[in-house]
Amino acid sequence: MFREGSRDDAALVKEGLFDKLEIGIASDVTIRDKWSCGEIKKPETINYRTFKPEKGGLFCEKIFGPTKDWECYCGKYKKIKHKGIVCDRCGVEVTLSKVRRERMAHIELAVPIVHIWFFKTTPSRIGNVLGMTASDLERVIYYEEYVVIDPGNTDLVKKQLLNDAKYREVVEKWGKDAFVAKMGGEAVYDLLKSEDLESLLGELKDRLRKTKSQQARMKLAKRLKIVEGFVSSSNRPEWMVLKNIPVVPPDLRPLVPLDGGRFATSDLNDLYRRVINRNNRLKAILRLKTPEVIVRNEKRMLQEAVDALFDNGRHGHPVMGAGNRPLKSLSEMLKGKNGRFRQNLLGKRVDYSGRSVIIVGPELKFNQCGLPKEMALELFEPFIIKRLKDQGSVYTIRSAKKMIQRGAPEVWDVLEEIIKGHPVLLNRAPTLHRLGIQAFEPVLIEGKAIRVHPLVCAAFNADFDGDQMAVHVPLSIEAQLEAKVLMMAPDNIFLPSSGKPVATPSKDMTLGIYYLMADPTYFPEEHGGKTKAFKDEVEVLRALNAGGFILKDEICGSRRDETGRGIHIHEKIKVRIDGQIIETTPGRVFFNTIVPKELGFQNYSMPSKRISELILQCYKKVGLEATVRFLDDLKELGFVQSTKAAISMGLKDVKIPEIKKEILKDAYDKVAIVKKQYEDGIITDGERHSKTISIWTEVSDLLSNALYSEIKKQTNSKHNPLFLMVDSGARGNKSQLKQLGALRGLMAKPNGAIIESPITSNFREGLTVLEYSISSHGARKGLADTALKTADSGYLTRRLVDVAQDVIITERDCGTLNHIEVSTIRQGSEELLPLKDRVYGRTVSENIYQPGDKSNVLAYAGDVLTSAQAEAIDDAGIESVKIRSTLTCESRRGVCAKCYGLNLANGHLIGLGEAVGIIAAQSIGEPGTQLTMRTFHLGGVAATSSTPEIVAECDGILVYLDLRVVVDQEGNNLVLNKMGALHLVQDEGRSLSEYKKLLSTKSIESLATFPVELGAKILVNDGAAVTAGQRIAEVELHNIPIICDKPGFVHYEDLVEGVSTEKVANKNTGLVELIVKQHRGELHPQIAIYADANMKELVGTYAIPSGAIISVEEGQRIAPGMLLARLPRGAIKTKDITGGLPRVAELVEARKPEDAADIAKIDGVVDFKGIQKNKRILVVRDEITGMEEEHLISLTKHLIVQRGDSVIKGQQLTDGLVVPHEILAICGVRELQKYLVNEVQEVYRLQGVDINDKHIEIIVRQMLQKVRITDPGDTTLLFGEDVDKKEFYEENRRTEEDGGKPAQAVPVLLGITKASLGTESFISAASFQDTTRVLTDAACSSKTDYLLGFKENVIMGHMIPGGTGFDTHKRIKQHLEKEQEDLVFDFDSEFESVAG
């Protein structure tokens, strides 16, 4: 099916001297005359006695070449001197046996056979060309019905189907010669050959212009695309029917003799034999003038045999082999993980590599790894042989090998010499990000295990419990140079995903450093002494050494010598440093001996987070080399100090808080009160469950804090070892500590629901049998989840890599004026991600001034922000910054360095050719796998991340913004809408209206912002002054209340008992509650409020959702602020990353979420218009233009807006997640990009994973690359077709130059799988998924792959056009680029207008 050119091009192909690859459909002539070396007529394979190939069979030497080098079949010619001679006896050419891997043959078919790919792959290519349905075609192809090819003068129609009875009837009526009707492949061949594609194309275009129905247009456009593919290529449609079948070279389908006279064979041989047998039988039958029924059956069987050969199982039952296993057809050879693409072309096994178990090598330098001598000897063998020959120690390779095997002394000397400066690559599977392969200088060691530096373990995610690593030797000078310059471990100390240090001390090292740097615990004054003062650090170190620095003495923890000198390592001392007297400890002075001087004196405790910050600071101030030295010193110091400190944990170190009994008693009392409330009917069962869980969550936190305070206390001026371990970040966390000494807390059932009664014991006290049994659920769920999710995460990474693999940095600056706007991310009043972190390393698109001072420029347009600039912008209180982004980059291919910003792995501007797409995919995929390993449980109120009350953080004035409130009888303000917030502003003596105006125009910044929920009770009036710590509002956590805002009398509307409502007696309380239930009728349950008891004047209506409990009675008089009904919030299940990974997948695959929310299509005011077919009609009316937009909303959905609410375009009207496609259609590209980036970040942020926005932006960019044609104008584009933005603009430019009408299009959001398959390169798409469909599609339109991306070049064995290969590739491709002029488009602003 590939068309690489004639046989003469084979040499070029072998050399790799081609820069594009075209695929097409092979004609019968090509198969027979160009590809084939002979026809196979017999199904035989090899002779059972001689084991030699049978002549004319599937392994024939005459056709395929000799099985032994330079030897013919009969043995007449046996030497290289006869090269090229064709034996006159056996007809075999004397040549190399490897030609049997290249030479093909063919089978001449008795009747034409339809290629199953073109008929069965959706959409059916043959069906679309002929305009026939797949089922009709199937009946013709498999000899069930006739199809009319030429109706002649009869009343039949071309392509009409005739069954046997009808056919006989027609023959009787008109005679056999009056028309032509056939069956099978022959019929399809004739129909395809007679099809005039040019006129069909014109006819389809006409019909497309005239058709108004969207569905019909889409159908026509699809057919048009296939027909156009044939017309514009050199393919003929009848080539989709085969007259000859190519036979794969025999060495690609080997027959291997096993012990005991049996053979192992490739499944293809069986499939070919079936075809040959049936074909030969059919030829014989046709010669014998056999009855039509038998012939027809034989033809059908041949068609099925060829189907099975190409794609077994695609039609009918698959052909089974031995052991009832389906045979692997040609399609299977290409498809899936074990297919040709992924197994052999994208992933090859590598020579000069080995693997072994890893152990820790604390004595190594950062750039070293320990390589076992035996391994090194094997890996560096060729280098050793060359050196031995150069030295004259040996003269032949064989003798050198023998010498190596003997282990002669000079071999070891040579090995030592060679290994110097020759880096090796270490790799640990799974390689989730680029830090999974790093280069090291090998150091020869005894033993059989590879030694690894402890600081690189984090990057490899390695531990020493039996992990294995692979070693690879870079052979060429270039490869060695790349490994040295780019891949050495010291160059990879920062994560490319976030720029945070990855080589940070952990476990023992952290503990040792923390111990050394701990706060003073020994104060001489308390022991009747005096604080010692030292003139400099050297004196302190002398005193330490004099004290022996061994910590045994009970009182002060040091060993004094005879003169009474010596100091405690944690003693408070004074010392002069840089001319200043500082209070510190000897430990800190000791630690500072390894800190680079530029960083100053570090005089504070050092948990792991601080160490990480110190490393980052060190890199910024003193550069890479000094940082790596510092890291090695940290490692050394950490291990030594943790060993000397000999910190170990005993059972007594786990202190149980004394207040535990009291707190538990109090909690049981509270739970009893909640239960009583439920029994009295005040709250629902859901609320009771929810409140109970809140109580226990609070108890858990209280006890956890009490325990932490308890172990923080020092005894005998010594630290609690448990506290040291947790606080330093070496091992354990607060939650594990809580389980050891406080209580285990709430547990989840296997289904995720939280069990109300917690485990009140801790591990020190021991668990009861019941408690142990409950807690075993969680432990098992964790393990099962881990196993299942790792696969999901790996698949997500694969899809991400595939969609972004060809995004590389192609130029320095694209010159775009487009930008995106970023601001601080807040949750309530808490700052989750400060602005400085979001803008660091990004390019500013316009000047940034100090607010109120235009002369002070903080950053100029085009600046890539440094951390100092980012900090200055944040400090200046600037709300948002306009930055350039890959989302708005206008590079012709790939993206530009300026739009991308800094390379986070080294803090420099990203270089040309850098594979940023793959880095982005790895950055998002790698934590996915990590997260699946830990399952987080957030239970009860913790899960809703909200608290029952809002407290002012500082003094100020409270301003209500966008809030509708009603004052209840107690004088509290109740919130009636969902979108408002409370703002705390500085008291500047302004009026309330001024404050509101300034806030809504963002002219002033609030000190704190509190978003408030529907039904919240605000305790302070609008505009009132509040003080820090004052309660501002109470939030209703367990119900969504429906509150009345006007006085009047209640009237039930459509609240029909037994239909839309039901009275339910509460099992526990015995009280009867009126609950609105789900119903199918045309009822619209609502409560109407009338001004008078006669129900004449209507004041307002309130829609009541299903599941709500009604709190008022018919005819009851009510006051504003009273509760009409309440909708209990569902029992809160535990959240874990199971919610996270599928959510990320859902976002990047652009799937429609379940129970999606409805969003407003225009700005306006909400109104209701009754009910239609179980759906509520909600109208948004624009007050100014009078424009209306109707929304049909299911009655089961909960509305979060009410009549009269003002909404803005894109605002949610109901609960649930938003459909991304709707955001695109309603709010435009910019809003969608912002939404997707923030939503993905939200998932990772919840897990405490830090990923830079730019990585997610690249994936989103790839999802928004296509546009959908809405009006093709005079272009060659088709209606409903998805085309690349660049292609669209180029086509429009051409059309406009020719004076034609340009096409119109709207942006379209594609999921990553669809986007990967829509890539320009068919090789890349075929190696991803749907291999057969992609290849069929490409072959029909004779697609050309210009080999511009990574995957296609790896598959073709070329150098990849990225990294160090970028420049080389650029030169090769320059002539291609000349053909296509460089264009810079302003895509996004154009589309904004279309979408908006």
Swiss-Prot record:
> Which reaction equation describes what this protein catalyses?
RNA(n) + a ribonucleoside 5'-triphosphate = RNA(n+1) + diphosphate
User: Under which EC number(s) is this enzyme classified?
Assistant: 2.7.7.6
- One Pfam annotation reads RNA_pol_Rpb1_4
Q: What keywords are assigned to this protein?
A: DNA-directed RNA polymerase, Magnesium, Metal-binding, Nucleotidyltransferase, Transcription, Transferase, Zinc
Q: Which residues bind Zn(2+) 1?
A: C72, C74, C87, C90
Q: Which residues bind Zn(2+) 2?
A: C814, C889, C896, C899
The record's remark on the cofactor is: Binds 1 Mg(2+) ion per subunit.
Name recorded for this polypeptide: DNA-directed RNA polymerase subunit beta'
Q: Which organism is it from?
A: Chlamydia trachomatis serovar L2 (strain ATCC VR-902B / DSM 19102 / 434/Bu)
Q: What is the lineage of its organism?
A: Bacteria, Pseudomonadati, Chlamydiota, Chlamydiia, Chlamydiales
